[in-house]
Structure formats: structure tokens, C-alpha cells
């Protein structure tokens, strides 16, 4: 049976943001001003990303009541400061598809604005004009939560309790799915979102045969897979490792699939489980203060105790804090480790 991961690191979410001063109005009512809070924004203003600007990693965590905080080891912001999601905006570029973004506000101890950040939900190009065509206070928290949700893509075959396979889009609430450690478990909720497959929203493709899978597996980049290797690489007494899909990318048989749109599906159970997708052991949705906003409000109202049962599974050593964050390239595991894990 799965147990909560002992001494687990605080659950965090990492997003790539630009300081407000990197994204300023080049033409319009607020010419020269940086992106700001919703009351200061004027529709039809044209913004531009300054040349040479690169996004910074902002690490977030959340209290039980949902209040967002800036976590330690963040590239920007003050650790422990409150973070407010001010609004959701839509930008229309001079060339290409619209880009949504979330305006985030860091608040100091006096309740005053300490900093403003823009979290673009698709890459921004420097020296390109972006016209502000929409601003709203609604939906920002849900969009942020969707970024944190681990997701499978349309067509992914999920193993049911009786051993048969079913495409994820054909699953229904109440269906019994096979879990690695707790037998058959009923699906409590199924989420579905369609998004542009670009940047951090682009899925990772694991080719057939890489991990004993007969078919390709396409899933969200932060989705953790349970990978077994004969050697205990960290001498911690475990040969099973939970590894993010993005950390297995090697440019060959595990790649990022950018371009077009992708249909993402999330599976929620009473607890966090390891299930089987295309035969590969992978985690289900972990419901925590960062991801629960992705669920409909009425679902949480009817299941008030659901969040209490969700803690990270301890089926294997979680590579993310142990190895990935010690690597010189935290976004990707060393090639030697990737090769060993895939044996």
C-alpha cells in the first residue's frame, strides 16, 4: 500500500516569468509603462518584450488555504512573500497566434506591491508588438493550476482493473482502474483541457519500446514515471525512481513535441496512485493546494475531504529533489543517469 513520502520536500511549482519592466508599452495610452495590475491596463496598448530578456524561474508553493507564496531557491522574488494572481490577459501579436498570460503581484509585509511579473502561457518574441485585447480577473488561478496538473494526452491507453486497455478519452467517472500498489480504484474525476503545444505546455513523447511500451506515450512534461533499474544509483536502498518526463528527454527516442494543439486529460482518484499508461507506470493527478483550482468548484464542495487523502506516493525514490536539483542542469538529468534509468 502506498504511504506518504516521508520527509518529502515541500510541493512547489516552477513557472517562467518576466519582470514587469521587461515588457513595456511601446504605443498606446500607457506608452513607456511596464505591464501592471488590471486597473492600470488599457486595452489596445501595444507591448514589446525588450531585446535580450530571458524569463526567470519563479518557484511557488501554497498554504492549505490556497494562499500562494514564493518558495526558496527562486531566481526572482523574496522567499516567503505572498503572491497574488491579479488578472488573466490575452495579447495579439503582430504575427502569429494570440498569447495568454497571467499578471502576478508580489506583496510585501505592509501589503504593498513589491514586484509585478508576467507569466506568458506561450513564448514571447522580443521586438514584436503585442496588443492587449483582453483582461479579466476570472480564470487566472485555474489556468495556473492546469499548468501544475500532470496529464495524459488523447489516445493514451489506460489499464483497467480487469487488465483491458481503454483510451483515456473513453474513461468515465466510476470506472475501475488498475493501480500498482492498491489494486482496483475508481476514477473520481476526469479533467480535459486543450492548449497550444508550445513552451512548458508542449508534451513529451516516449517512443514505443523505450520503457517496454508497445506504443508511443505522450504526456505532460512534469508527469512523473516510475522507472526501475537494477542498480541503486544513489545508494538509498531503492531501485525504483520517480522521474519527470522532461528529465528523460534525450533528443532521440524521448523528445518534446512542440507545435499545434494538444488535448490533455487528468485522472483523479481518492488518493494519489501509480497507474499504467501504455504499460508504463505513471502517477495520477495529485490534488494539493496548487492543483485543486483546476477542479470545478462544485466538485470540491461535494467532496470536502478529498484533499486530505492526497499526499505524494512513496512507490519509489523521487528523483526530482534528490538528483535533478543537484545536477548542474536542473532541468535535465545527466545523460549517464538517463541511460541507466531506461535499462
What are these regions (language model features)?
Residues 87-93, 177-179, 206-207:
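Short conserved beta-strand and strand-loop elements enriched in small hydrophobics
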Residues 98-102, 168, 181-191, 197:
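Short, Lys/Arg- and Gly-enriched loop/turn segments at beta-strand edges
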Residues 2, 6, 11-60, 68-79, ...:
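Sequence-level preference for short, compositionally simple segments enriched
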Amino acid at each position: 500500500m502506498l504511504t506518504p513520502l516521508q520527509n518529502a520536500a515541500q510541493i512547489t511549482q516552477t513557472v517562467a516569468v518576466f519582470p514587469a519592466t521587461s515588457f513595456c508599452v511601446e504605443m498606446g495610452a500607457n506608452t513607456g509603462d511596464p505591464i501592471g495590475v488590471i486597473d492600470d491596463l488599457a486595452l489596445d496598448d501595444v507591448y514589446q518584450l525588450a531585446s535580450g530578456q530571458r524569463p526567470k524561474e519563479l518557484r511557488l508553493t501554497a498554504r492549505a488555504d490556497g494562499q500562494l507564496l514564493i518558495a526558496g531557491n527562486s531566481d526572482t522574488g523574496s522567499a516567503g512573500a505572498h503572491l497574488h494572481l491579479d488578472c488573466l490577459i490575452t495579447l495579439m501579436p503582430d504575427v502569429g497566434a494570440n498569447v495568454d498570460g497571467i499578471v502576478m503581484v508580489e506583496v510585501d509585509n505592509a501589503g504593498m506591491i513589491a514586484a509585478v511579473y508576467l507569466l506568458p502561457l506561450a513564448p514571447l518574441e522580443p521586438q514584436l508588438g503585442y496588443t492587449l485585447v483582453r483582461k479579466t480577473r476570472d480564470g487566472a488561478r485555474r489556468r495556473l493550476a492546469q499548468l501544475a496538473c500532470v496529464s495524459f494526452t488523447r489516445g493514451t491507453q489506460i489499464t483497467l482493473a480487469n487488465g483491458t486497455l481503454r483510451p483515456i478519452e473513453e474513461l468515465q467517472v466510476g470506472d475501475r482502474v488498475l493501480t500498482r500498489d492498491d489494486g482496483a480504484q475508481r476514477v473520481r474525476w476526469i479533467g480535459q483541457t486543450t492548449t497550444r503545444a508550445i513552451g512548458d505546455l508542449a508534451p513529451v513523447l516516449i517512443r514505443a519500446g523505450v520503457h517496454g511500451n508497445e506504443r508511443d506515450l505522450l504526456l505532460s512534461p512534469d508527469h512523473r514515471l516510475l522507472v526501475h533499474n537494477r542498480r541503486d544509483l544513489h545508494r538509498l536502498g531503492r531501485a525504483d525512481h520517480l522521474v519527470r518526463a522532461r528529465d528523460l528527454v534525450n533528443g532521440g527516442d524521448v523528445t518534446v513535441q512542440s507545435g499545434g494543439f494538444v488535448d490533455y486529460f487528468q485522472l483523479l482518484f481518492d488518493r494519489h496512485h501509480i497507474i499504467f499508461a501504455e504499460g508504463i507506470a505513471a502517477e495520477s493527478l495529485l490534488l494539493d493546494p496548487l492543483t485543486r483550482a483546476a477542479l470545478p468548484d462544485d466538485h470540491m464542495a461535494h467532496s470536502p475531504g478529498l484533499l486530505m487523502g492526497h499526499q505524494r506516493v512513496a512507490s519509489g525514490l523521487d528523483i526530482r529533489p534528490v538528483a535533478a536539483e543537484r545536477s548542474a542542469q536542473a532541468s535535465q538529468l545527466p545523460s549517464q543517469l538517463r541511460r541507466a534509468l531506461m535499462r
